[in-house]
Amino acid sequence: MCIRDRLLTWVNKGYEVITLTASCGLMLKFEWPLLLPNDEEIKKLSKHTKDIDEYIVDIHQKECIASGIQEIDSGVTVHHACHARAQNMGNKARDMLKLIPNIKIDLVERCAGHGGTFGVMKKTHYIAKKVGKLTVTKIAKKNNKYMASDCPLAGKHLQQLEQDTKITNNEAIHPIEILAKAYKLI
């Protein structure tokens, strides 16, 4: 059974497919249907796929999220990754984090330079570092403890650049982890 059919088994039972990374969401929602434009099953899967931040925001708008959310210990710089911006859904990571009481959120909408394997390949790593350097500088100026990116690879790449350049020591995590901190789950 192929991945499409496995995911559709759940979609046909009434579930949504929730992606944890912006690149996976972009692939399932937009790129796969472009690659196979005549496949109705792929179109169906695409319509029932959501980014995890988008999913939480939708739940809150429809039903309100669970009580018990508390302030966190510091501000957050949200890196709005390229693959999230390409989905044209707005900045759902920021919208989700706004659910946390009294949170300070700063936004950086700039390429991290990672680009999937581009950022780790020996031949292109130096370019990835060069592209990401300005983004890291912008993040450092925000002076927040946390840097949350809806693309974990971009977040880790930016964190590595921070360590290489000795700019700052942000903790790079996924926005859903910030929400988990606000619920005292981690």
Stretch-by-stretch model annotation:
Residues 1-186:
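Iron-sulfur cluster-binding electron-transfer modules in prokaryotic oxidoreductases
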